[in-house]
Amino acid sequence: MIDKERIKAAVRELLIGIGEDPDREGLLETPDRVARMCEEIFAGLHQDPKSVVKVFQEENHEEMVMVKDIPIYSICEHHLLPFIGVAHVVYIPRKGKIMGLSKLARIVDIIARKPQLQERLGSEVANVIMESINPLGVAVVVEAEHLCMTMRGIKKAGSKTVTSALRGIIKTDARTRAEVMALINGR
């Protein structure tokens, strides 16, 4: 679990390190606030995304299932700044084995709630779906703005990073992959 006391002590030291007075009125409760925030935004560190999976059997359904524009936020593990965007999750069931739609969003949420790389986030989501229901194929496309590119360094506000994780037939069959990307892009 998260050690709130260590987080509070570290935040206090950070404030001192940047030249702030952690005992001034506006900062007095900041260490506690940050510790509580960490408990929430890093909750995925202590959750198994497979624990939310619920599998249904829908006779002979082998057509694409897509949930688009799932809002996401995560924390870039390089700078501990947020990246915010959307995830699109697509899978093609095998022999009618399907997953509840809300479970796709829950998997994304759990995996995003930890220090993360966008590339790994999509890959981990795809792997959980593959391992849970063994579909014919999975695609996870993540579009996000990274505040480490907006607030520091290159300072390119509004730029988006797009990553994809493809598995099964969606990776190996060009026509299927093109259909998935067209659906994601609204064409």
Curated annotation (Swiss-Prot):
The reactions it catalyses are: GTP + H2O = 7,8-dihydroneopterin 3'-triphosphate + formate + H(+)
Q: Which GO terms describe its biological process?
A: one-carbon metabolic process; tetrahydrobiopterin biosynthetic process; tetrahydrofolate biosynthetic process
Superkingdom, natural source: Bacteria
* Family annotation (InterPro entries): GTP-CH-I_C/QueF, GTP-CH-I_N, GTP_CycHdrlase_I, GTP_CycHdrlase_I_CS, GTP_CycHdrlase_I_dom
Cite the entry's keywords alphabetically.
GTP-binding, Hydrolase, Metal-binding, Nucleotide-binding, One-carbon metabolism, Zinc
Pfam families, from UniProt?
A: GTP_cyclohydroI
Q: Is Lyase tagged as a keyword?
A: no
The residues the record assigns to binding Zn(2+) are: C76, H79, C148
Query: Mind telling me which GO cellular component terms the entry cites?
Result: cytoplasm
Which cysteines bridge via disulfide bonds?
A: none
Q: In which pathway does it act?
A: Cofactor biosynthesis; 7,8-dihydroneopterin triphosphate biosynthesis; 7,8-dihydroneopterin triphosphate from GTP: step 1/1
Q: What is its EC number?
A: 3.5.4.16
Q: How would you classify this enzyme at the top EC level?
A: hydrolase
- Provide a Gene Ontology MF annotation, just one: zinc ion binding
Task: Name the family the entry cites.
Answer: Belongs to the GTP cyclohydrolase I family.
What HAMAP family does UniProt report for this protein, alphabetically? FolE
Q: How does it assemble?
A: Toroid-shaped homodecamer, composed of two pentamers of five dimers.
What's the protein here called?
Answer: GTP cyclohydrolase 1
Q: Which species is this UniProt entry from?
A: Acetivibrio thermocellus (strain ATCC 27405 / DSM 1237 / JCM 9322 / NBRC 103400 / NCIMB 10682 / NRRL B-4536 / VPI 7372) (Clostridium thermocellum)
